Design a protein with these regions (language model features):
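N-terminal active-site segment of His-dependent metallophosphoesterases
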Residues: 1-56
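Residue-level preference for short coil/turn positions at secondary-structure junctions
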Residues: 7-8, 35, 64, 129-131
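Beta-sheet entry/capping signal
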Residues: 10, 38, 67-69, 133
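Short hydrophobic-aromatic micro-motifs
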Residues: 13, 128-129, 133-138
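Histidine-centered divalent metal-coordination motifs
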Residues: 18, 74-75, 137
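Active-site neighborhood of divalent metal-dependent phosphoester bond hydrolases
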Residues: 48-130
Length: 140
């Protein structure tokens, strides 16, 4: 996690969360973001850990508390690609997408992921640039 103070609040970067809601909650409790803070999340919110759905809920809630700038990670890109392509869905599942689906407690699969989660993923940017920093997900 990188942190910088800016004129209108703090600029904070948070790296790969990978479905670990408790870790994200601990970070957010420690930094206690406010409306003047900008948080850049660097992608890979989902897969591998047990709580991907909850992580997306936390990030959506966080966007109401501060300026949130979500960056697209390769795991989110795989999930988005899997919506319309069965081969992409198989690849995504083999890279941790099965854990993401399990976090929704749905047997029916990808069709039961809430629309607000898809909207959040679609809002993710490829990068964010400030006067001093360029933020991106480095796995490309």
């Amino acid at each position: 996690m990188a942190k910088e103070n800016s004129a209108s609040g703090r600029l904070i970067a948070i790296g790969d969360i990978h479905g670990h809601a408790a870790a994200l909650e601990s970070i957010l409790d420690a930094i206690d973001p406010g409306p003047d803070d900008t948080i850049v999340t660097l992608g890979d919110y989902i897969n591998r850990g047990p709580d991907s759905g909850q992580v997306l809920d936390l990030l959506i809630d966080l966007s109401r508390r501060c300026q949130l700038i979500p960056i697209l990670g390769n795991h989110e890109e795989m999930m988005l690609d899997s919506r319309d392509d069965p081969h992409a869905e198989l690849r995504w599942k083999s890279q941790g997408g099965d854990a993401t689906l399990a976090s929704y407690e749905q047997d029916a699969g990808i069709g039961h992921i809430p629309q607000d989660h898809w909207n959040f993923l679609l809002s993710c940017r490829p990068y964010h640039e400030t006067d001093k920093f360029v933020f991106t997900h480095a796995n490309y």
